[in-house]
């Protein structure tokens, strides 16, 4: 299988229950909910998307002809050797990573001692073997992934009721204030998310700490 990757980079996980953990991110190009082009944003399922996933021109990005080649590029992004008392953490994101992530790539990374995570919109079935699953549902879509480690809901999001996800088999329910609204809009989103979490204690507030820190 050929993989199209926007970028590969080493940073700290900024979101969710594993925030603060060092990881290599592999951002796949392409998504099934938006083309990524500005002129198509009004028709996108998630017009608030804040990610550039178009093309293969980012740092470490490119077209990789097979799983072994892509795995080698991911492993090379770690500034330390694998097997030094730490299990390397690889996060596949996008775009929509489930369109490209497959079992051969997962198996190679596992063979090198890596832990494999995915950040997905949940509309595409996942391959087996993923160690940590984060689903971020979008209004108007049907979930193909109804269980996992964390469900991360961007809020506010028109057309979604957070309580409708509480019966699904996720260990953690997270509410992430919507960005892309400007500083004032983000503040309002944070206030709404705080109010929801205070009134619904199954939910935890999830901030995008990497944006506050100014890291990728």
Curated annotation (Swiss-Prot):
Binding residues for S-adenosyl-L-methionine: 95, 136-138, 176-179
One MF term in the entry's GO annotations: magnesium ion binding
Residues involved in Mg(2+) binding: 51
Enzyme Commission code(s) on record: 4.3.99.3
Cofactor(s) needed by this chain: [4Fe-4S] cluster; S-adenosyl-L-methionine; Mg(2+)
Keyword Iron: yes
Residues that hold [4Fe-4S] cluster according to the record: 31, 46, 49
Reaction it catalyzes: 6-carboxy-5,6,7,8-tetrahydropterin + H(+) = 7-carboxy-7-deazaguanine + NH4(+)
Cofactor annotation remark: Binds 1 [4Fe-4S] cluster. The cluster is coordinated with 3 cysteines and an exchangeable S-adenosyl-L-methionine.
GO biological process: queuosine biosynthetic process
Pathway(s) it belongs to: Purine metabolism; 7-cyano-7-deazaguanine biosynthesis
Stored InterPro entries: 7-CO-7-deazaguanine_synth-like, Aldolase_TIM, QueE_Cx14CxxC, rSAM
Keyword Transit peptide attributed: no
Amino acids binding substrate: 12-14, 27, 93, 216
Residue ranges of domain Radical SAM core in the record: 18-216
Endpoints of the signal sequence: none
Keywords tagged on the record: 4Fe-4S, Iron, Iron-sulfur, Lyase, Magnesium, Metal-binding, Queuosine biosynthesis, S-adenosyl-L-methionine
Primary role: Catalyzes the complex heterocyclic radical-mediated conversion of 6-carboxy-5,6,7,8-tetrahydropterin (CPH4) to 7-carboxy-7-deazaguanine (CDG), a step common to the biosynthetic pathways of all 7-deazapurine-containing compounds.
NCBIfam families: queE_Cx14CxxC (TIGR04508)
Assembly information from the UniProt record: Homodimer.
Family: Belongs to the radical SAM superfamily. 7-carboxy-7-deazaguanine synthase family.
Name of the protein described by the UniProt record: 7-carboxy-7-deazaguanine synthase
Organism, as annotated: Nitratidesulfovibrio vulgaris (strain ATCC 29579 / DSM 644 / CCUG 34227 / NCIMB 8303 / VKM B-1760 / Hildenborough) (Desulfovibrio vulgaris)
């Amino acid at each position: 299988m050929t993989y199209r990757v926007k970028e590969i980079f080493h940073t700290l996980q900024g979101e969710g229950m594993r925030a603060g953990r060092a990881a290599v991110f592999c951002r796949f190009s392409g998504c099934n909910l938006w083309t990524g082009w500005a002129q198509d944003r009004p028709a996108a399922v998630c017009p608030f998307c804040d990610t550039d996933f178009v093309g293969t021109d980012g740092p470490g990005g490119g077209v990789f002809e097979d799983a072994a080649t892509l795995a080698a590029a991911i492993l090379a992004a770690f500034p330390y050797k694998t097997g030094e008392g730490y299990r390397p953490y690889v996060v596949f994101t996008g775009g929509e990573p489930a369109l490209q992530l497959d079992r051969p790539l997962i198996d190679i990374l596992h063979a090198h001692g890596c832990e494999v995570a995915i950040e997905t919109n949940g509309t595409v079935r996942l391959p087996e073997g993923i160690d940590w699953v984060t689903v971020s549902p979008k209004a108007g879509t049907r979930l193909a992934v109804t269980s996992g480690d964390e469900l991360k809901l961007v809020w506010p999001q028109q057309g979604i009721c957070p309580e409708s996800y509480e019966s699904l088999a996720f260990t953690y329910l997270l509410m992430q204030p919507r960005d892309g609204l400007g500083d004032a809009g983000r503040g309002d989103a944070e206030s709404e998310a705080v109010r929801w979490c205070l009134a619904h204690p199954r939910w935890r507030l999830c901030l995008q700490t990497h944006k506050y820190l100014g890291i990728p």
